[in-house]
Amino acid sequence: NPKVILYDIKKIHPNEIYYFSGQSSVGKSFFNPLETYKSNIELPFLILEFIRFNKLFKIKFYNSCSTDSFGQTAKIFKNENDNFSPLSPYGNAKSFSFWLTKYYRETYGLNCKSGILSNHESPLRNKNFVLKRIIDFARNRKKNQILKLGNISIYRDWGWAPEFVEAIYKINNAKSKKDYVVGTGKIVSLKYIVSKIFKLSKINNKFLQVNTKEYIRPNDIKKIRSDPRQIYKDLKWKSKL
């Protein structure tokens, strides 16, 4: 409830705000773009405007953006200077939230920043996300059960969420008001991950079905890799993966 959130901000006067809410599934965003746009743009907009209007300039606001905003271009290695060219409603929404945050920082002087995060995983990951689905399948598989996946020939920069939280805290508390790309700087294919998990779990590949229609996205990024050198240079953060 936006009204409740804004009321709490005015009442508590927090030192820091971290916006992690919003529909975050790329696949789901194709089927429910309205929810994706509203949840990733509307509330950050309201919070930023509330901070500006009430002159709460001491608040440090962090907006969580995504490397999905970069889309598919010839250059795979993405840094803070690369243009956005998103292929999904999710990527579009995150792009908008990035520019919105940057606008309020540069125009109104708010202490607000974005982290452009690559994929990151943890045990808390929603069961509908692909790596969580693969791991849950391997752990809880029933006899003759088949794992259905979409395109597994994609490459992603997969990181560890607890590490990324450290980077996020550094970004929001840095003296400089800058946005940063956060990732491992390495890529691995989904196909490789599936094969590793199946091998470790001693599951025959005949129980894997790929290119399943319900999991194929209308548009998908083939390869994307983060270039996190700037955050290491400025804030001394680096993934241990």
Model-flagged regions — what are they?
Residues 1-120:
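N-terminal Rossmann-like NAD(P)+-binding domain of SDR-like oxidoreductases, especially those catalyzing
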Residues 41-49, 128, 162-165, 169:
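Conserved active-site region of classical short-chain dehydrogenase/reductase
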Residues 3, 125-129, 188:
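Conserved catalytic/ATP-binding subdomain
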Residues 131-132, 138-241:
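C-terminal substrate-binding subdomain of Rossmann-fold SDR/epimerase-dehydratase oxidoreductases
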Residues 44-52, 102, 133-137, 191-196:
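Short, well-ordered amphipathic alpha-helices
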Residues 82, 86-93, 123, 127-131, ...:
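The catalytic Tyr-centered alpha-helix of NAD(P)H-dependent dehydrogenases
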Residues 70-73, 123-125, 189-191, 220:
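A short beta-to-alpha transition loop/helix N-cap that caps and shapes the active-site region
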